[in-house]
């Protein structure tokens, strides 16, 4: 009886794998992004560099009013939809990406007079056969005691070889798109004007 039970389990597992692959190929999968986590690269930027970054608070992040609400809700990769696990919003995913980096570095302080807010300006990904492309842009604003000290739009992009098979191309494109959030936060931390605005006092 045991060998038959094992064989049956293997068959079920095989069918489950085939169905998962088929769903990607057929274009009917919902693909949630992974929750934001601190990165070694951004942690190094927060702890090093000059001037040193002081404690900050992360305020509201919203979608640009000129954009359709759908831009904040999902991106399509060969008819599969990538969605944010943070309130179903890419603007909130960007906020959380920044927040967890600051928290991990011990720089998040709700009482700080330096507040970072953001506006999601662009969010896109394309994964045709050939070259895949993704882009993410946002405007970041730093206020200190109510006075604007920094206001700048930043953008990051990615391109990669996109294969024919959806079972490979779709997760690859989703990973490239998700990585842009960490890269955009990294670009913010590299900006000398931003560092000056949130410098330790």
Task: Name what the model sees in each region.
Residues 1-6, 111-113, 117-120, 195-201:
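Extended alpha-helical regions
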Residues 28-92, 193-201:
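A structural "domain/chain start" motif
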Residues 29-41, 104-171, 175:
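Surface-exposed short loop/turn segments
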Residues 99-107, 125, 185-194:
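Sec-exported extracytoplasmic/periplasmic mature domains
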Residues 1-28:
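Sec-dependent bacterial lipoprotein signal peptides
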Residues 72-87, 147-190, 198:
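Short secondary-structure boundary motifs at beta->alpha junctions and helix caps
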Residues 79-107, 118:
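Mid-chain, structured segments of secreted extracytoplasmic proteins
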């Amino acid at each position: 009886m045991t060998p038959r039970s094992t064989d049956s389990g293997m068959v079920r597992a095989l069918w489950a794998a085939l169905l998962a692959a088929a769903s990607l190929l057929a274009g009917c999968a919902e693909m949630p992004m992974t929750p934001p986590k601190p990165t070694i690269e951004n942690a190094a930027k927060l702890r090093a560099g000059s001037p040193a970054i002081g404690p900050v608070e992360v305020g509201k992040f919203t979608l640009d009013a000129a954009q359709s609400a759908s831009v904040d809700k999902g991106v399509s990769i060969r008819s599969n939809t990538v969605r944010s696990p943070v309130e179903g919003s890419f603007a909130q995913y960007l906020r959380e990406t920044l927040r967890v980096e600051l928290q991990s570095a011990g720089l998040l302080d709700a009482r700080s007079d330096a507040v970072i807010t953001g506006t999601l300006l662009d969010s896109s990904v394309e994964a045709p056969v050939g070259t895949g492309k993704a882009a993410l842009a946002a405007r970041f604003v730093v206020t200190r005691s109510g006075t604007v000290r920094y206001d700048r739009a930043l953008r990051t992009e990615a391109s990669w070889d996109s294969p024919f098979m959806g079972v490979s191309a779709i997760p690859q494109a989703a990973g490239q798109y998700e990585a842009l959030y960490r890269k955009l936060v990294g670009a913010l931390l590299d900006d000398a004007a931003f560092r000056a605005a949130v410098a330790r006092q």
